[in-house]
Amino acid sequence: KEKGIENYILSGDAYPHRIPKYNDAERLQIFRENAIVGMLKEQTYTEERCTIIQEFQKAGNDADEKHVGKYSWYESYLRNGRRALENYLGTEKEINFEEVNRLVHAFKAGGEKLWVRHMGREETELWYEEKDFTGIKVLLVEWTHSNSEYYSGVDIPIYLDSTPQETLQSRLERNRDQWIDNPFTMMVLDIEQKMLKKQSEKAKLIVTRDGTVLDRKEYAQFVPKLQK
């Protein structure tokens, strides 16, 4: 905008299927249910072990890997729950990619008045705003999933490099999650971070933690492990 190019920033945070507290609950339910079902399939489940698991669940720390140190069978619970989470997070099951894609393609086709979605934290905080895009030349989509395989229409994909700890700090400041610093949230962040690192291969530009803008080749030199 400083250079005279009109733009609009669209927040992808408004496009999950569920408001934050319901999506948090869905994530936890998926983890816990599939953890138990997986144990049943592997024949590592017993009624006695279920009692132990339920105590951890009540304490809100059933995703803590430290439990494996005392109960070796607990690895089955964690592994099966995590696998189910990996199949949910950042997919069409969680995010309404179709609606985002429709908006992006409508903008690129020259649409002038488009409905933009907004989402708060409560059931009543979901609404649409008719935005006039007349004269707007650039649509910036600010989104965790901007390099997702489910998302189309991006001309210049950008990846913002960060660590799970930095993401956690950002969410603490925004008060975005329930149980923000518990083991389950850290598991979610770890899964998302690995997913984003993989998707970063699609990015044409990478912004490092100090604000430096790099292309793919420069970033590979900046982060040697990407060259492996």
Q: What kind of region is each of these model predictions?
A:
Residues 118-125, 138-144, 186-191:
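Short gly/ser/thr-rich secondary-structure transition/capping motifs
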Residues 19-22, 150, 169, 212:
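Short, function-defining helix-loop hinge/capping sites that tune catalysis or transport
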Residues 67-79, 125-175:
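ATP-dependent NMP and nucleoside kinases share a basic, alpha-helical "lid"
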Residues 1-2:
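Glycine-rich phosphate-binding P-loop
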Residues 5-124:
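Conserved nucleotide-sensing/catalytic segment adjacent to the nucleotide-binding pocket
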Residues 156-160, 165, 169-177, 193-228:
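NTP-dependent small-molecule kinase module
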Residues 101-104, 179-200:
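Acidic, metal/cofactor-coordinating or nucleic-acid-engaging core segments within structured domains
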